[in-house]
Amino acid sequence: MRRKQTKKPAVPSARDVLLGITGKDFTIIAASKAAMRGATVLKASDDKTRPLSKHILMALTGEAGDTIQFAEYVQANVQLYGMRNDIELNPSATASFIRTELAKALRSRRPYTVNLLLGGYDTINDKPTLHWIDYLASSAPVPYAAHGYAQYYCLSTLDKHHHPDISFEQGMKILRMCTDELKRRLPIDFKGMIVKVVTKDGIREEEYKDDEPVACP
């Protein structure tokens, strides 16, 4: 009997940029605005983030259809859990749920080609959180993270300058160093970055001007 073929998960393209940085009492999530297919920019103001609750923010990159479908699925289920149980899932439980769903899909005929960062604030333990999750359902809590081109050029900068008790101003300065490095090294216009911050007070969007030219070495 011939075995039925299943769809193999394709490696998500690295053309997008996702960055996550935690500090003393905040988590910064930054995502490139350009929606691209190959070398073509389809949209210059694409928001790759999705709020899952008041204190949890998800940023995704990957195949366009997979990211939208998976984001809506996770968003709806997290909100449904909150309505049924009258309590919000904490960031760690949400990361576990996302990892489980990716693992189930990976073993099915239609895996999701999605990489994501899950930033949040744990109101019970009073600390910021960040989870790095990839399309193979690997998940890890980390102090900083990157997906896409950012993981090739920014992790060394983050490793050098990040420490657990950085202030918000220091976190934004490190983010600026990362985006400047991307502009310096890559011949790609990401159309700027959308920056959002998660604190104990909730999620807010931070103004971030990324139009200044950077001198190449």
Task: Describe every region a protein language model picked out.
Residues M1-P217:
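Long, low-complexity N-terminal extensions
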